Every structure is written in C-alpha cells, then in structure tokens.
Amino acid sequence: MNCKILFRKELNDSECELSLLLVGDSDMKEINRLRRGKDKTTDVLSFPLEFDFSPLQKILPKNTSSDQKMFPPVALGEIVISIDTLQKQAKEIGHSEKDEFYRLLVHGFLHLLGYDHERGDKEEHIMKLKEDECLEILQGL
C-alpha cells in the first residue's frame, strides 16, 4: 500500500510527476517574496501547474491498462522545501528530519492536488485527515 492509493480518486489512476526543490532559508525567503509577496521564509511552498479550479479527476486522463503508455505523466507542479526550516522544526517538534521531510512533502503534495487549509475550518480538517492518513503509511517505509 502506498500514498498513490490514498489519492487514486484525485489522480484518476493517471501517472503524475512533480518537481521537488530543496533550498536554504535565504532562497526560500526570496521565492516566497517573489511568488507570494511575503518577505519571510517558510517551511514549504507549492506551485501547481494547473490553475483551473476544476476537480483534478475531470482534467486527468483515465489510465487503463491498455493505454498506460499512451499518455505522458501529468505534471502537477513544484514543491519547494526549506532544509533549514525543516531541521529547526524537526528539533522543535521532537521527531526525525526524515519524518519532518515526509510531513512537508505530503503537505505540499496535498496543495498541488487542490487541498487548502487556508479556506476555512472544514477544508483545514479535511486536509489534516488526508495528511495524517498519508503520513501513517509513509512512516511504515
């Protein structure tokens, strides 16, 4: 079992890819300033390539065994993680850097899929449940 199973509905069984950029706090601060107008560092940023707010399953091609090789992977976007902040947060929370990396990666991935904790309490709750579900699987790896 892996995270792909958790997101089967969202990904419509399609092959997808994303870019992952690991940076220091100074670069993260600059990216955050340029892309979001916030002059501070942060732990993770996500930049989806699909700006249509339709559900992803309407956009992604259905992947069946016969046409698995027919479609190239769908590029979901980019996740940027600050290694400096990751290390600080792991120490503050009291878990490993690997666990913090997984937490930030899952958080960023959920944003690429359209989940957004900043849209209100209900959305935050839904995103937190998905995050916890995926992290439980990843911790077994």
From Swiss-Prot:
EC number: 3.1.-.-
GO molecular function: metalloendopeptidase activity; RNA endonuclease activity; zinc ion binding
Annotated GO biological process: rRNA processing
Keyword annotations from UniProtKB, A to Z: Cytoplasm, Endonuclease, Hydrolase, Metal-binding, Nuclease, Ribosome biogenesis, rRNA processing, Zinc
InterPro entries linked to this entry: MetalPrtase_cat_dom_sf_prd, YbeY, YbeY_CS
Enzyme class: hydrolase
Cysteine disulfide partners in this protein: none
Cofactor binding: number and manner: Binds 1 zinc ion.
Cell compartments where the protein resides: Cytoplasm
Binding site for Zn(2+): 107, 111, 117
GO CC list: cytoplasm
Keyword Iron-sulfur carried by entry: no
Protein family according to the UniProt entry: Belongs to the endoribonuclease YbeY family.
Role: Single strand-specific metallo-endoribonuclease involved in late-stage 70S ribosome quality control and in maturation of the 3' terminus of the 16S rRNA.
Name of the molecule in the record: Endoribonuclease YbeY
Source species: Leptospira interrogans serogroup Icterohaemorrhagiae serovar copenhageni (strain Fiocruz L1-130)
Gene symbol of the encoding locus: ybeY
